[in-house]
Amino acid sequence: MKVGFIGLGIMGKPMCRNLMKAGYEAVVYNRSKASVEELAAEGAQAAGSPAEVAENCQVIITMLPNSPQVREVCLGENGIASAAKEGTIVIDMSSIDPVQSKEIGAELNKKGIDLMDAPVSGGEPKAIDGTISVMVGGSKENFDKYYDLLMAMAGSVVYVGELGSGNVAKLANQVIVALNIAAVSEALTLAVKNDADPELVYKAIRGGLAGSTVLDAKAPMMMAHNFKPGFRIELHIKDLNNALNAGHAVNAALPLTSQVMEIMQSLKADGNEKDDHSAIVKYYEKISDTSVEKEN
């Protein structure tokens, strides 16, 4: 099967590479040409625009930064809709506002193009080894039809519901992760301010109800002051903003999300937006006049 892939960034490039390893023919487009040239050298067909991808493929995956980019690639000049044949399927794996997913899907549908939203979780390491989690919204018929395609890039692929539901699930994930990281930061700050060893506190609580994937992934980074990004603060701000917009659209109260969003905005103002989101602890260190960093 020939598959179009638009958006070859940190996540998109390894995901596309995994499709190629699974035997799919890839037609690729990216605004920056270096990634296109890299995958073309590995056997992909290079395209000069989203429209050219659509001319060559009836299955197209997009992996883009946010809603405006998805809208432009799908509906803009030289976009997918300008050249796609009726019956084309677009699988948008970007993390965007679910309201936007529905609006873009409705416009594509007028031209006989189906849209599925299929955002992912797991970050670059899981994109590389093909174990990302995929949350899918759209028709169940399309989910069943393209399940194997998605599994070529993933460790799990779950159908959530109608179009937009995939992004609702992703935003729920991002809310939980953000609030958990803030809670870990707060707890380690409490420990240090009470003269307790934060590493021993971490070891004491990780086997109980407070134990979590977030605790195990982020507490060691905080104590090492290693903020090399697995997921940057600026990207989490984008996701929380989308979550708040989605919540406001349906009158869902998200007070804790709003609070953590303000913490992240404060960190951005201090120049930390490129740091891993575990750098939320810097906010707590600053206002508490302390550090959770362990001495070597």
Model feature map: region roles:
Residues 1-63, 88, 93:
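NAD(P)+-binding Rossmann beta1-loop-alpha1 motif at the extreme N-terminus of oxidoreductases
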Residues 32, 66, 139:
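Residues in the short beta-alpha loop(s) of Rossmann-like NAD(P)-binding domains
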Residues 95-174:
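Rossmann-fold dinucleotide-binding core
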Residues 129-137, 158, 163-194, 203-217, ...:
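Active-site-proximal catalytic alpha-helix in oxidoreductases
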Residues 163, 167, 211-277, 296:
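Interdomain hinge/lid region at the active-site interface
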